[in-house]
Amino acid sequence: MTYRGLFVGLTTLDFIYRSDRPLQANQKVVAQDYLTVAGGPATNAAVAFNYFGNQAKLLSVLGKHPLTELIKSDLSQQGVATIDLIPDKSDTPPVSSIVVTAATGERSIISLNAVKSQANPEIVAPDLLTNIDLVLLDGH
C-alpha cells in the first residue's frame, strides 16, 4: 500500500562534508568528500518517506533565489512534490554546513534555520489535507 504524506516545515540547502576528524577552534580541515542536498527536518523526512515507496508532499518556504534551484532540483530527483509558501521570496534560502566525522558519524551543524523564512498560514489551500494519510510538522 502506498501512503500519501504532507511534510510541513523547514527546507535548507545543506553542505555536508566528510572529515577524518572533528573540527577544532581555529583549524582548517580539507574534507574527504562532500554533498550538496536539500535538507531540514521536514524535508529529510519527506525524502525518506518517498524513498520507501510512498508519496511525499512538502509544504515549505522555497522562494526564487538562484540557490533554491539546487533545492528544487534535488527534491524533484527524489520524487518529492513541493508547495512553496513564499514563491516570490528572493532572499537566500537557509543554508546549513554540516561536518561529519567519518570514523564515528558524529556531526557538527551550523545553520540559520527558519529565522528569516516565516510564512503566512493564510496562503495554505483549505483542501490541502484531502487524500493525505499522514502529516508531519517539524516545529520550524
State what each model feature region is.
Residues 1-61, 66-70:
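Glycine-rich phosphate/adenosyl-contacting loop at the front of the ribokinase-like
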Residues 68, 72, 94-96:
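Generic internal hydrophobic packing segments that stabilize the cores of diverse globular domains
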Residues 37-44, 89-92, 116-121:
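Short secondary-structure boundary/capping elements
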Residues 52, 78, 91-94:
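Short, basic and Ser/Thr-rich N-terminal targeting/leader segments
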Residues 25-26, 30, 95, 112, ...:
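Residue-level signature of transmembrane alpha-helix interfaces in integral membrane proteins
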Residues 32, 39, 95, 137-138:
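Thr-Gly-centered strand-to-loop micro-motif
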Residues 1-11, 61, 72-87, 99-140:
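Ribokinase/PfkB-type carbohydrate-kinase core domain
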